[in-house]
């Protein structure tokens, strides 16, 4: 099939994304396989692009790296970044040394759009800012209160400012487009209440309640620390078909040793834990996260932060049922989540905190307003206009279009965001453990007996167990060394030798000290006694679930 234009200055619909994925797989059949891991509520495929070189060995015998995107419908920049990762790996194979090495030695599992139903709703006017996963039309899951609706018919969901003497807001004196908070004890002005645009179900004439949506927030639908009280958590863990398909993919590929889930927004690289402080985590694992995170910060400018410590304003209300806690706390996989794009930093606002729900002063709002008006035009800002609301009476509708400002960058900035974040993920992938048979010697002892000695080592940055929590949970498989003999027999020592775990370079960040982290072994020898009468061949295999499989063959006689 012909290759459509693949540009990284726009956001693609499901059909457009599917067309490009199929074209990339068709253009690179020796490296890429496109499959569907499941279907959404509305019957759309959840696509998986697997990238690797089968000529260099089976995929499950290589370290795997996993990327997913758009688990939340409105996070369109994430899907673009995952598509960029696919495009970058395929089009740079044979041209870029690092890409070629990674594709030859590892395998990539990339899910560019986990939530195709919600994404499709969010991409079309009126650009719903929260769509769940399409189980419900936005608002249909709410029993009463404010329902998102484009009541003025301009094609955008924005804000309603409602005159109210009890209101929390007032218009800025210097820029009436901006709403500033009413100060404690302030009286005597024109005040407003600010609501998302919509109508009110079962309105009592007084209150405008806003219910949390029930529709699936799939990043609260995973087994670890799952709670039904989390908004969008589903009826039980993995109740949502897309989340269940993701979980099956991860469980079916035990070679996955690194992960990144793309989100928007905030311009940060997130690490575990979602539910506990650093003091309750493995210090060695935290050091691992920080060192790999430094590489991400150098490439993207995004700081690496703990979700619990730095991204949870109320420690009594932690996020439960997240993908990252499941993959790290249960399986020990070094997992990151990147919040792409930071409007405020781009607009010149100094970073004060990592979580975005906090009051903005007038100066901050003015900087953001100026940037949005200059760079996003009517798609980012809707001028306030009078409207006679059927329930609230005279209101004004307008303001920031959050989905095309705070949640997603303008097209002219998108490609650089994609590029730098994908480069970080490739560095993370390259940190995988890599088990090799470094040497294989055969010493003749006479009478057809031979002593076979091999040295098995880990050439990677990460240990073969990946993390301390993997050992604590008893899920880290040991490195195995085995021998096969063609034309002879094994005389002494087991056919399969359990070598335990092999450390990576990460332990040795500074010269040895009795007060520092003590070093574990990165290599181990193994010996066998074999008998071969005449000519034969021996093959020694080093196998690690996370660090790959390597074989060395030697002829005897």
Task: List PLM regions with ranges.
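Metallocarboxypeptidase
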Residues: 33-34, 68, 109-111, 117, ...
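Short beta-strand-to-loop junctions in surface cap/lid or active-site-entrance loops
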Residues: 48-58, 70
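Acidic carboxylate motifs that coordinate Ca2+ or other divalent cations, activating on Asp/Glu
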Residues: 150, 154
């Amino acid at each position: 099939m012909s290759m459509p234009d693949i540009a990284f200055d726009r956001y693609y619909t499901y059909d457009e994304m599917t067309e490009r994925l199929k074209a990339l797989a068709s253009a690179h059949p020796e490296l890429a396989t496109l499959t569907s891991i499941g279907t959404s509520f509305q019957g759309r495929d959840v696509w998986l692009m697997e990238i690797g070189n089968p000529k260099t060995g089976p995929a499950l015998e290589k370290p795997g790296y996993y990327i997913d995107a758009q688990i939340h419908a409105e996070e369109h920049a994430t899907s673009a970044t995952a598509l960029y990762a696919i495009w970058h790996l395929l089009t740079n194979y044979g041209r870029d040394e690092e890409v070629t090495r990674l594709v030859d030695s590892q395998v990539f599992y990339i899910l560019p759009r986990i939530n195709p139903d919600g994404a499709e709703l969010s991409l079309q006017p009126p650009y719903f800012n929260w769509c769940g996963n399409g189980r419900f039309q936005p608002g249909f899951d709410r029993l009463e209160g404010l329902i998102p609706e484009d009541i003025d018919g301009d094609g955008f969901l924005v804000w309603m400012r409602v005159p109210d003497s009890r209101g929390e807001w007032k218009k800025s004196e210097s820029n009436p487009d901006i709403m500033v908070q009413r100060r404690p004890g302030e009286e005597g002005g024109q005040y407003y209440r600010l609501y998302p645009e919509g109508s009110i179900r079962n309105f009592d004439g007084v209150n405008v309640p806003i219910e949390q949506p029930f529709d699936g927030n799939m990043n609260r639908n995973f087994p670890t620390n799952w709670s039904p009280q989390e908004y969008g958590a589903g009826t039980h863990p993995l109740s949502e078909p897309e989340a269940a398909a993701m979980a099956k993919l991860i469980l079916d590929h035990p070679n996955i040793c690194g992960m990144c889930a793309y989100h928007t927004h905030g311009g940060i690289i997130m690490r575990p834990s979602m539910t506990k402080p650093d003091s309750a985590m493995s210090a060695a694992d935290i050091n691992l996260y920080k060192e790999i995170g430094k590489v991400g910060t150098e490439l993207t400018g995004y700081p690496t932060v703990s979700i619990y410590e730095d991204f949870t304003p109320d420690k009594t209300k932690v996020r439960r049922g997240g993908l990252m806690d499941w993959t790290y706390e249960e399986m020990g996989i070094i997992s990151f989540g990147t919040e792409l794009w930071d409007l405020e930093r781009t607009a010149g606002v100094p970073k004060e905190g990592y979580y975005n729900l906090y009051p903005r002063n007038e100066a901050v709002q003015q900087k953001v307003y100026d940037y949005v008006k200059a760079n996003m035009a009517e798609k980012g800002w809707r001028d306030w206009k009078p409207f006679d609301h059927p329930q609230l009476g005279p209101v004004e509708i307008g303001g920031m279009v959050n989905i095309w400002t705070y949640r997603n960058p303008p097209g002219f900035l998108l490609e650089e965001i994609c590029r730098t974040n994908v480069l970080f993920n490739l560095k993370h992938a390259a940190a995988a453990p890599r088990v090799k048979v470094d040497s294989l010697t055969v010493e003749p002892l006479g009478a057809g007996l031979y002593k076979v000695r091999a040295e098995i080592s880990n050439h990677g940055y990460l240990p073969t167990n990946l993390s301390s929590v993997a050992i604590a949970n008893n899920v880290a498989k040991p490195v195995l060394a085995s021998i096969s003999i063609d034309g002879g027999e094994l005389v002494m020592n087991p056919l399969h030798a359990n070598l335990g775990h092999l450390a990576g370079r990460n332990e040795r960040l500074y010269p040895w000290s009795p007060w520092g982290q003590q070093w574990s072994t990165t290599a181990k020898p193994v010996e066998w006694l074999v008998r071969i009468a005449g000519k034969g061949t021996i093959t020694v295999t080093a196998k690690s679930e996370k660090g790959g499989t390597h074989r060395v063959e030697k002829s005897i006689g």
